[in-house]
Each structure stands twice: as structure tokens, then as C-alpha cells.
Amino acid sequence: MLSLLIRGSISIPIDELESSLHPDLFTHFLLSFLINSKKSQLIATTHNREILNNKDIFRNDSIWFTNKNESCATELYSLSDFDSSIIRDTSNVYNAYKIGKLGGVPNLGDYYIDLDNEK
């Protein structure tokens, strides 16, 4: 698949790109694509938040997050949508994401489940 992406002029969507890949192979695949591909586009989803540590690899407009709104509809927004006071060039995007500054984090609620007062 990588040779197809590098040689061709295509867009390929891949859901959960890191699935069944060693983390080093995942990073190697992305870097190989970014360095060698001139005309193709890779659109990938991931739950691998550690990828946010690689600020040197991705531009802010190439990282997108999803959030569920009150109507349970999925909203999509880019890292580049954030004000510079939230994300600066020197800030750690991974840490900003982990503490909830960027959204896209599930609302887990409490660990305790009260089965007696269940609605």
C-alpha cells in the first residue's frame, strides 16, 4: 500500500491506521509516506494520542479532533482552529489534549454506578 501511495496520485482513507501495527512501524509508515509522497493524500483515524507528541511531523491544520455535542452529533475541528493562547508553537499538544484543553476527550463520568436509582 505504501508504494501505491508514493507512486500514485490518490487519496486513501484508513480507519485506525495503527491497528495491528507496532508503534515504531506506525511512525515509520507515516514518516515514509510524508517524506516520499508528492501527490497522494492519506486520511487516517487513530485513537493513538501519543501521535500528538510528534509536533515536528504534522502541521496544526492536519490534526483534527471529534466531539459529541448535546444532540449526540459529531463535531469535527482542527488543531489550527485554537487560539494561540491555548496552543503555542512551544506547547506540548499531547499534554493540552490530556488535560482537556482541546476537547475530543470522552466524558467518563463517575466510577460508581447506582443501580438502585437507575432511570
What is each PLM-predicted segment?
Residues 1-14, 24-28:
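GG-anchored amphipathic helix commonly corresponding to the ABC/SMC/Rad50 NBD signature/C-loop
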Residues 28-119:
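C-terminal lobe/lid and adjacent interdomain/linker elements of RecA-like ASCE P-loop ATPase modules
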Residues 19-23:
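Conserved D-loop-proximal element of ABC-family nucleotide-binding domains
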Residues 14-16, 45-46:
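Short His-Asn-centered micro-motif
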